[in-house]
Amino acid sequence: MLNKDNYILNSLSDLDLSPTMEKNARDKYIALCKYLSEKGLDSDFQPQGSFLIGTTIKPYRDGKNQDYDLDVLAILKRNKDETNAERVKNDVGDLIKESGIYSDKLKKEDSNCWTLEYAEVSNGIGFSLDVVPAVDEIDDIKNVIILSGVDISKVKKTVAITEKKGYL
């Protein structure tokens, strides 16, 4: 019975993002944030989705393990009223494209993010970072959200992300 339990526990632990892989991914987006800052684009990066809440699982498609798909927000430090989605997205993308380090990792452009693909990190598995450019949401919108009953601590973290129509 112990062997079956160990097998199940090992199988489950293989599904999760390992601490080594998580640290590697965090190091990568911190380095990208630093690069953007050095190029004059002041931003903060933070994990998003399953990467944020620690529920990332290894993808499995067509009978094969796939690379992890991790999402991070690139929150530009600028007023939403003074920019637009196209500019926010392209300011990040243009710097990625001109970098010798990041341009080689850039996959095809998505409508609201830039995807950087990293080679094998551990046991034949790598990951990609979906970098989602965003700006802080304006106070008027935040106030409407608060009035709808959402907890203020959550509203303070509200950002506006780029989307297909080119509006924030």
PLM regions with names:
Residues 71:
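Glycine- and aspartate-rich repeat motifs characteristic of hemolysin/RTX-like Ca2+-binding segments
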Residues 1-68, 76-87, 113:
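N-terminal regions immediately upstream of nucleotidyltransferase
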Residues 36-39, 86-153, 160-167:
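Conserved catalytic core of two-metal-ion nucleotidyltransferases
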Residues 49-60, 149-163:
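Phosphate-binding glycine-rich loops and adjacent basic patches that engage nucleotide phosphates
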Residues 49-52, 74-80, 118-122, 133-135:
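Short, flexible loop/turn elements at secondary-structure junctions
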